Amino acid sequence: SYMGTEKPYEAFLSMILRHLAPGGRVVIAIENKYGLKYFAGCREDHLGTWFSGIENYADGGGVRTFSRKGLERIFASCGVKKYHFYYPYPDYKFMTTLYSDAYLPGKGELSNNLRNFDRDRMLLFDEKHAFDGIVEDNLFSVFANSYTVIIGDGFDIKYVKYSNDRAKEYQIRTEICRDADGIATVKKIPLCEEANEHIRGMAVAYRNLLERYEGGRIGINRCTLHEENGRVWDSFEFLEGRLLSELMDECLEKQDQEGFRRLFAEYVERTGYNPDYPVSDFDLIFGNIMVQGDDWTIIDYEWTFGKDVDAKELAFRAVYCYLLEDERRNALDLDWILETLGITEQDAKQYREQEMDFQKFVTGQRLSMAQLRDRIGGDLLKPTDWVQRFR
């Protein structure tokens, strides 16, 4: 109705394109009508009704969102040939991560799916598990919750993750860039001036960890500090391979406890090398280790401190974080872990309390998006619970 034409979306885009300067870009941020969250029980954003987009707006109305194919049909109708799709996650309203066709999410990455700040939602299934299957079948571009589309020239940046729910001195973003020759680089960039020293500290951590693990069986991803025209950032190699957490997940999915134990024992042996050296990477979680055949590399060592931390504490923390990320990992025999590491129940309690203190250290007075949703967001309605109650 706003455009007063039979094809208002095409007319609106054509009008915008006429205002572009040479080399200009149009940026479109929009919901995906087939976003997974709408299947899982989120309401349509504009109408506040369930399944309206999925049902192709059968009840009418002037509001529309589109699938990727739907957007591409509009572009073709307007003569647009150069465009690039990005995928804000969880969605474009409260994005923490931005993916692209050149860098799609891996299995296990899409776990922060509750963002219903404005209204109640149903919870019909676990979106993380559904996303895992979608990622495996290469369907993420179909079921991503939102799209950001760049009409015009693209960017070297193929992936961005914002770590901004922290104290200001630790707020950074992580980018993966790919140049015209296809060479990928990882960058860590401060989001504010207060975080400059944190970026500089990663280059120091790289050198210190190299010294600690010299002669051992684990590598450190190379870090280079850059300072130009008042800007500070770190660059890292982009390593191919598989995360240790992925390999461990495969073992649990196959009920291969022995395979998991072998990987864990190797983790303890490799990361525990030279334990008396006064440098420790406190965040030696399984997802921060890349495995390429027999080569293991620590790819993220942001939280490295100039002191020795007991290897069993670091290993326990890695397991603790691993279990918190996915309830399906509860198949892991935690008693075996405690026995292997020589950790008592009292030790475990102390380590959990230390983890809470560490999280407070990182976040300062800030709350994560998940914590904010828990405090001020809408309710979660679980029809599956009602079905069981009234059967």
What is the predicted function of each stretch?
Residues 70, 84-175:
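Rossmann-like AdoMet/SAM-dependent catalytic core
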Residues 6-25:
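A short glycine-rich, Lys/Arg-flanked "PGG" loop and its adjoining helix->strand segment in the class I
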Residues 158-210:
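ATP-binding glycine-rich loop module of kinase domains
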Residues 61-87:
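Short alpha-helix
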Residues 219-268:
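Conserved structural core of kinase catalytic domains
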Residues 25-50:
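Conserved class I S-adenosyl-L-methionine
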Residues 46-59, 276-330:
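Catalytic activation segment of kinase domains across protein kinase-like and atypical kinase folds
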Residues 297-390:
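C-lobe/activation-segment region of protein kinase-like
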